[in-house]
Amino acid sequence: GLITKGDLTVSISTGGTCPAAAACLRERIENAIPDGTEDVLEWAHQNRERLKKHRVLKQAVTKAFSLNRPLTEEEIGAIIGNL
């Protein structure tokens, strides 16, 4: 089954081996995706080039997901300033 949250798509399949297991895993993974995921992905899309330029894209996205929200300009500046 597919899990879709905004631009995030996760697919779970057992190749027909055990659809019940796939359904169970799908539910667990869906419940593990934080509520702010769609907002973080949209924010990451809008700031991707700037963050890539400073080589902090992964660090900034990791921080945003840990907070379950997009980073503020101040938080981005702090990450870029710590280079």
Predicted features along the sequence, with ranges:
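Rossmann-fold NAD(P)-binding glycine/threonine-rich loop
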Residues: G1-T14
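An accessory alpha-helical subdomain
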Residues: G16-L83
